[in-house]
């Protein structure tokens, strides 16, 4: 938990009455309070309802109030008051600004923050993930993104989103963004159309490529190219090519965690989009060629209770044999310290029978610890997992591999530096 200093506590109480009329449906008051204080500290735009106030005028009013009460002297000092207790903090003077949608516990945020970016708005529906996000990033994310008007979101250079895979209507790809109505992707597209950031990074499971026989991916890309965005698949292919051709070209967007210094066989699709006319192209990162092994992420003295019981171990082995016979997959993945990688860690770790198990000489294998799950996703040891082990496994399983985000963020940052 964060130990807030007196200035931060007083500032929160002081601005709360002003915040209340700007809180969107299904979001906490604390989310707007945090966003305002962070916006002052990082010189970013306020989230606000434009029907009530203009963002810059509201920000000036709040800063004036804080100054009058001795809570604000300089931005640098206020930055230290706001972020001083955080182990993972942004830079005082950011190179670019981004928003973090479907944020989870902030894995995507970390990758961009450590490359000089600052988060100006975050959104996450799950209350447990929100709390972990707060403990590490100092802010409660806004809630249901479908209840937040796009024009109220602060200006940003990069939109980041890891969204669920949902099918679209087969009405005929005739209505553009309206073809996506009723899906969470529609809200992402609406924000892109309204705010027009220079870049967007959309992360999803590799299965998005084959989802609904490639139709889902085609709708996503066609919708965004019609809004003025480009990706590594040519526009004429997206508009007139077959779904098979799009699927083939989309394979370049799939990156493996093990190729970027993390011993986990996790594959995800990372759709990088840029504003046509502002950015010429984007080259996906190549594997780093770093040799890794599972032992790199293991703790020296794991808790004895991580070792699984005889009954559980026998059940795992029996189900693995049965699954293999029935062609249902092979269940758990048993690895040693010398193994080059684990299988993919999932949000249902230790519930679906496909978990990572660590071999132990002379005794039953063991589960990985929450800290090891964090390391398998590239989270630094300074990151504070949920106090609930069930939630910690779920949150890391649902997250991204920070190392992969880091290399993508570096490339996007370099292009933005060239533009700016």
Regions found by a protein language model. Give the residues of each.
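Class I S-adenosyl-L-methionine
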Residues: 148-158, 168-344, 348-350
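Residue-level signal for pocket-adjacent positions within structured domains
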Residues: 140-143, 163, 172, 179, ...
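Short alpha-helical patches at coil-to-helix transitions and adjacent helical residues
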Residues: 105, 217, 268, 398-406
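Short coil/loop linkers at secondary-structure junctions
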Residues: 118, 230, 291, 380-382
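Core alpha/beta nucleotide-donor-binding catalytic domains of modification enzymes
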Residues: 64-218, 222-225
């Amino acid at each position: 938990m964060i130990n807030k200093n007196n200035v931060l506590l007083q500032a929160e109480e002081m601005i709360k009455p002003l915040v209340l009329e700007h809180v969107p449906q299904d979001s906490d008051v604390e989310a707007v309070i945090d966003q305002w204080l962070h916006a002052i500290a990082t010189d970013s735009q306020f989230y606000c309802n434009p029907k009530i106030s203009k963002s810059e005028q509201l920000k000036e009013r709040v800063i004036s109030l804080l100054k009058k009460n001795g809570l604000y002297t300089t931005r640098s000092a206020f930055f230290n008051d706001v972020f001083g207790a955080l182990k993972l903090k942004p830079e005082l003077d950011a190179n670019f600004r981004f928003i973090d949608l479907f944020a989870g516990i902030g894995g995507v945020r970390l990758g961009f923050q450590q490359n000089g970016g600052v988060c100006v708005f975050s959104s996450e529906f799950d209350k447990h993930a929100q709390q972990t996000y707060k403990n590490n990033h100092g802010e409660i994310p806004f809630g249901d993104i479908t209840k937040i008007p796009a024009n109220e979101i602060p200006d940003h250079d990069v939109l980041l989103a890891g969204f669920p895979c949902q099918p679209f209507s087969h009405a005929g790809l005739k209505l553009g963004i309206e073809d996506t109505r009723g899906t969470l992707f529609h809200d992402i597209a609406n924000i892109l159309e309204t705010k027009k950031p220079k870049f967007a990074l959309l992360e999803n499971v590799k299965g998005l490529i084959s989802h609904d026989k490639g139709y889902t991916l085609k709708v996503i890309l066609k919708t965004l190219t019609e809004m003025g965005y480009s990706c590594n698949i040519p526009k004429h292919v997206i508009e007139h090519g077959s779904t098979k051709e799009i699927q083939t070209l989309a394979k370049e967007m799939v990156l493996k965690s093990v190729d970027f210094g993390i011993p986990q066989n996790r594959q995800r699709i990372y759709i990088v989009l840029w504003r046509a006319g502002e950015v010429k192209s984007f080259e996906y990162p190549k594997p780093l060629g770093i040799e890794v092994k599972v032992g790199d992420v293991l703790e020296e003295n794991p808790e004895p209770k991580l070792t699984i019981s005889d009954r559980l171990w026998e059940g795992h082995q029996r189900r693995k044999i049965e699954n293999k016979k029935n062609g249902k997959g092979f269940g758990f993945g048993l690895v040693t310290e010398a193994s080059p990688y684990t299988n993919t860690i999932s949000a249902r770790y230790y519930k679906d029978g496909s978990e990572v198990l660590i071999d132990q000489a002379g005794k039953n294998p063991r589960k990985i610890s929450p800290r090891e799950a964090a390391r398998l996703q590239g989270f630094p040891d300074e990151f504070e997992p949920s106090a609930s082990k069930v939630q910690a496994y779920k949150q890391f399983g649902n997250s991204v591999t920070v190392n992969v985000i880091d290399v993508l963020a570096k490339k996007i940052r370099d292009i933005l530096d060239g533009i700016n």
